[in-house]
């Protein structure tokens, strides 16, 4: 029988429920338990695919093409397990499903209500994850904060869930904040008491409290929490702020979280193997030579919009053995200013994905700067499309070249709409999404990094390289090193005369793991480290460095 752990949050939003859920997943997996993690988001959007990055942050894409919350990225990276569209549920998708059933007549003329129809649909989605993958434990994170009106149907559903599947199969974990008040010189438990009181008024009694704090809980705090929240002292878990999110599983292991979860769910206590994770964190904190990577993007005001890119760079830096310093650059700032003022001194440039014309000329300026100054470069999705435009204008002498997305009337649309997108009118969920194969050119940098002929990567785009210009580009030194198996879609481009210049139509960042860095990011960071070393020694790189994978 699958066990279920529900993770709620109290006091403040963005308290770290996703990291706690992902960390618990890692701890259970280290004990050889199979785990799946589900995110219940209370917003009414069907999915985050059409939401502004400034409001939502990154849209994480799964293998099966679901556009999901960024927390699913944490789940995958911590557990090294691929999630699917079943692992992401929103209020909008629940209501959409219920209304579709009502229109079909599935409810036989009954009055459709929050209870039981909405709550039943929520419970069905949870059970579907258990049925699909048959894990030992399903961890369910409920988005938002206890007390939010949007979360009430989810909380009611998980209250009912315990009765329906058996009390011995369900555990409630509440992540809360214990703030330090400097003027009083003490930690305050009252916000947590009120949060737990709110949960109990709904009918949910937490079994475990995970207490976020910026310092150790001093003696007596756990006893007080236990007394006022009706939770055993050993189930009051300290989760102190860490330098890196990857240390959190180790902190929670020391606090005995996994052992307590297994005890409450009547599961066998097994010895964890966290040696690889411990080594990862030790490498992360070890002093190393620095590399400074510029991320030139449109949404840098909210860096969570590029969360998987940041994490993939961190994974690579750990593997390569260097200290990662990120320089965030708003691409709009480069449109009317000298790129040298913003990019001078960096050892690598990343131009990530995005949509729309705003800031595109700044991205193109950054690409030109990296190309001309022999700085290691990595372009992702829109970053690749901007590389194509820059090459067309600067090298192929098509000065008016553009993407049909930015200028539908351009006489040289080097980037064009995918044929299957021509008649699409609805924006949500209609892009080229999910995992697709890509065939690599054998004598290319891409092949040198991947060491495979056919790779699989995740996509999220509507536009592609226009093959009408392919021969012109190839004649000017442009290399298409990766394409769809039928040769129609350009997936990877590179410049062999550059120390490291590669760009992809797909999003490699979604498949990077802390213990298995993505080969493109590892190669890029290694090239950035070489560039930094050469610059320190007064050398100018003139050829592609030898890259180990």
From Swiss-Prot:
Residues that coordinate or bind L-glutamine: 354, 382-385, 405, 462
Pfam families (UniProt xref): CTP_synth_N (PF06418), GATase (PF00117)
Activity-regulation annotation: Allosterically activated by GTP, when glutamine is the substrate; GTP has no effect on the reaction when ammonia is the substrate. The allosteric effector GTP functions by stabilizing the protein conformation that binds the tetrahedral intermediate(s) formed during glutamine hydrolysis. Inhibited by the product CTP, via allosteric rather than competitive inhibition.
Sorted UniProt keywords: ATP-binding, Glutamine amidotransferase, Ligase, Magnesium, Metal-binding, Nucleotide-binding, Pyrimidine biosynthesis
Binding site residues for Mg(2+): 71, 141
Superkingdom to which the source organism belongs: Bacteria
Binding positions (UTP): 13, 188-193, 224
Single GO MF annotation: metal ion binding
Gene Ontology CC terms: cytosol
UniProt xrefs under InterPro entries: Class_I_gatase-like, CTP_synthase, CTP_synthase_N, GATASE, GATase1_CTP_Synthase, P-loop_NTPase
Alphabetical list of NCBIfam families matching this protein: PRK05380.1, PyrG
Subunit structure: Homotetramer.
Record's miscellaneous remark: CTPSs have evolved a hybrid strategy for distinguishing between UTP and CTP. The overlapping regions of the product feedback inhibitory and substrate sites recognize a common feature in both compounds, the triphosphate moiety. To differentiate isosteric substrate and product pyrimidine rings, an additional pocket far from the expected kinase/ligase catalytic site, specifically recognizes the cytosine and ribose portions of the product inhibitor.
Function, as annotated: Catalyzes the ATP-dependent amination of UTP to CTP with either L-glutamine or ammonia as the source of nitrogen. Regulates intracellular CTP levels through interactions with the four ribonucleotide triphosphates.
Family from the record: Belongs to the CTP synthase family.
Protein name: CTP synthase
Native organism: Cyanothece sp. (strain PCC 7425 / ATCC 29141)
């Amino acid at each position: 029988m699958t066990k279920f752990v529900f993770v709620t949050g109290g006091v403040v939003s963005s308290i770290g429920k996703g990291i706690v859920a992902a960390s618990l997943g890692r701890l259970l997996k280290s004990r050889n338990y199979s785990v799946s993690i589900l995110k219940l988001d209370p917003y009414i959007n069907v999915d985050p695919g059409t939401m502004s990055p400034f409001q939502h942050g990154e849209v994480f894409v799964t293998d099966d093409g679901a556009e999901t919350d960024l927390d699913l990225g944490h789940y995958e990276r911590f557990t090294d397990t691929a999630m699917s569209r079943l692992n992401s549920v929103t209020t909008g998708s629940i209501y959409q499903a219920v209304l579709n059933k009502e229109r079909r007549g599935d409810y036989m003329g009954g009055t459709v209500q929050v209870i039981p129809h909405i709550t039943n649909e929520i419970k069905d989605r949870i059970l579907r994850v258990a049925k699909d993958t048959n894990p030992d434990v399903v961890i369910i994170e409920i988005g938002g904060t206890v007390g939010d009106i949007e979360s009430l149907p989810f909380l009611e559903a998980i209250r009912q869930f315990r009765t329906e599947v058996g009390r011995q199969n369900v555990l409630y974990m509440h992540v809360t904040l214990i703030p330090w008040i400097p003027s009083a010189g003490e930690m305050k438990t009252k916000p947590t008491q009120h949060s737990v009181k709110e949960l109990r008024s709904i009918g949910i009694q937490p079994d475990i409290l995970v207490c976020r704090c910026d310092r150790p809980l001093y003696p007596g705090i756990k006893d007080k929490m236990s007394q006022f929240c009706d939770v055993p002292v050993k189930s009051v878990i300290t989760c102190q702020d860490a330098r890196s999110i990857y240390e959190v599983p180790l902190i929670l292991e020391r606090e005995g979280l996994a052992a307590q979860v297994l005890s409450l769910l009547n599961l066998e206590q097994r010895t964890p193997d966290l040696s690889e994770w411990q080594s990862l964190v030790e490498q992360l904190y070890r002093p190393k030579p620095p590399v400074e990577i510029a991320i030139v993007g449109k949404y840098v005001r909210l860096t969570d919009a590029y969360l998987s890119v940041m994490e993939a760079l961190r994974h690579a830096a750990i593997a390569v053995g260097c200290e990662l310093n990120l320089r965030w650059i708003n691409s709009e700032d480069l449109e009317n200013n000298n790129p040298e003022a913003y990019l001078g001194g960096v050892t690598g440039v990343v131009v990530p994905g995005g949509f729309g014309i705003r800031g595109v000329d700044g991205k193109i300026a950054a690409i030109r700067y990296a190309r001309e100054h022999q700085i290691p470069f990595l372009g992702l999705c829109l970053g690749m499309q901007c590389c194509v435009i820059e090459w067309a204008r600067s090298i192929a002498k098509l000065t008016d070249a553009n993407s049909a997305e930015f200028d539908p009337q351009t006489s040289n649309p080097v980037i064009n709409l995918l044929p299957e997108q021509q008649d699409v009118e609805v924006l949500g969920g209609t892009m080229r999404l999910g995992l697709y194969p890509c065939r690599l050119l054998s004598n290319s940098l891409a092949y040198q990094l991947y060491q495979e002929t056919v790779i699989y990567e995740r996509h999220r785009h509507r536009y592609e390289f226009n093959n009408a210009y392919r021969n012109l580009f190839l004649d000017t030194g442009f290399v298409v090193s990766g394409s769809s198996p039928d040769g129609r879609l350009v997936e990877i481009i590179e410049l062999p005369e550059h120390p490291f210049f590669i760009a992809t139509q797909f999003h490699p960042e979604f498949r990077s793991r802390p213990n298995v860095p993505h080969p493109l990011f590892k190669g890029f960071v290694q090239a950035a480290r070489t560039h930094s070393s050469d610059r320190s020694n007064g050398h100018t790189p003139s050829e592609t460095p030898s890259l180990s994978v």
